[in-house]
Amino acid sequence: IRDSFLTYWTVFMSTLLNLEPTMLIAAIFAVLHVIFTLRVGGYRFSNNISLGDGGDKELLNRIRGHGNFIEQVPIALVLLLLNDLNGLSDMAMYTLGGVLLVSRIVHYLMITTRSLPMVLRPLSMIGTLGTILVSAFLLVF
């Protein structure tokens, strides 16, 4: 009985802790967070602005790009983790994570550089909020 319990427990724990999709997605977003933070901090340092935006439009855009990222990504990552723990397929996890990643990068670029077609900004929010809503829906149904 002891050996069968240990075998069952080992299989259960290895399945439960098989969170590669979430770990990869979270790691990518962690790197983006550091990059976006350094873009704000570096600009502050080079322009001697320690608090607020100092009336600098470029700094304001960088602050809001980073802030919007921080406002949206944590809840999405929590929902993705819960779906991963709930057994959502790796393909579905990578699809949701990929949509979120592309959406967040495009949205950040739209806020900070405005170098992409304006139609992409609302589309990037649709991708972000869609990922959040689909992830929530999958947890309930």
Annotate the PLM regions.
Residues 68-80, 132:
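Core segments of transmembrane alpha-helices
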Residues 38-64:
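Cytosolic, membrane-interface loops and tails of multi-pass inner-membrane proteins
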